[in-house]
Amino acid sequence: MPAAAATKAFPFDYEQVDFPNGLRLITIPTDYPNVVALYIVVQAGSRNEVEPGKSGFAHLFEHMMFRGTKEYPPEKYEAVLKAAGAASNAYTTDDHTAYHTTFSKEDFETILRMEADRFQNLHYSEDVFRTEALAVLGEYNKNAANPISKLYEVLRDTAFDRHTYKHTTMGFLKDIQDMPNQYRYSLEFFDRYYRPEYTTIIVAGDVHKEEVRRLVEKYWGAWKRGSYRPQIPEEPPQKGPREAHVPWPSPTLPWLAVAFKGPAYSDTEKDLAALDLLAFAGFAESSELYQKLVIREQKVDYLEAENPDRLDPYLFTVWARIKNVADVNYVRDQILATLDSFRKAPVPPSRLEAVKNHLRYRFALSLDSSESIAATVARYVALRRTPETINRLYDVYARITPEDVQAAAARYLTESRRTIVTLKGTER
């Protein structure tokens, strides 16, 4: 690895190719022999579900995309994967849907051709659609039996008014219940978003760039560009603190979510990076609050802060699971006091440097296989369509000062931007 590359957060040599139809290809040769990881990222997630009554369709298509084509019906698709010893799966997020497969390099052309067919020629009947829509309802009901899933759903519904981040990737229950009746709309959704200009192909592993480029051009080059652009509703400014409570119908430990409207993803501005560092400095296992609440006082058995990357402004959230319902208010006040301390004074420089070093080291350790490299790139290309955004983001981390963290806390972690949600079960 060249010395210059070794200093980058994402140190791998890669090729980025844009095809005339809008498709982007990112090829990352690695030193892991014989294995290839293929990620196909579609920049359509629950954020794109802009029509009232139509939430949940991005996630539904994570299911529908495995229902086959005329050339590769489901049983043939599975047989090809089995013969190749391939592992295939998918996931849906707010901002994108990703389909991923890992296999031996000798099967690359076979898998790439089959994937090109399902992205361009997906075919399913209304009966098949209804069956899959009902399966999604079953998945929602299963998730709804989990307290943290319900807490998360209520938090988003309470915090957001207009933006599509108001609903989770599963969608609103009433929309999921109506989903079996939306066959024609499903065809429209696929036609809008499963287009080359929304799609990035990531290939990482034992490959040659020229051969990958040739095969992608062969099987994906004729895919026709679309024209649809969603109008994502803008979230109005929050005018004051919000609260909600989720009564849980059975015994469970109480949960607490303390959230604030934060910034959108940026690999140039400092605020998002500063809040990422604050989340770790204030709430990781090495933090004073974690040591106090979890280790010494043992009032909490789970404490974490997160500042997820999203295309649009999202939520900085502190999550806590509390052992005794009588301590919920105490834990809430301790969390708020910790956040207030970041607004009032800069984080100690030594603490900030330790956090930066830990995050950089942890990221480097995570890039330990072709699959993990492709998976990481997939998360970031959904935001900026290039792996270079990783290097830019970590350059921003390196420039963050204690005063930058304090300024971001003062700007975003304020009462007027706050939403608190609690969940408490019935008494044992």
Language-model-detected regions and their locations in the chain:
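Short strand-connecting beta-turns/loops that link adjacent beta-strands
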Residues: 30-34, 195, 251-252
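Beta-strand elements of well-folded, non-transmembrane domains
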Residues: 42-46, 262-264, 322-324
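M16/MPP (pitrilysin/insulinase) zinc-metallopeptidase core fold and M16-derived inactive scaffolds
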Residues: 38-102, 167-171, 283-299
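Mature N-terminal segment immediately following signal peptide/propeptide cleavage
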Residues: 7-40
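Charge-rich, well-structured scaffold segments of protease-associated domains
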Residues: 18, 76-228, 296-428
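His/Glu-based metal-binding/catalytic segments typifying zinc-dependent metallopeptidases
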Residues: 41, 228-288, 396
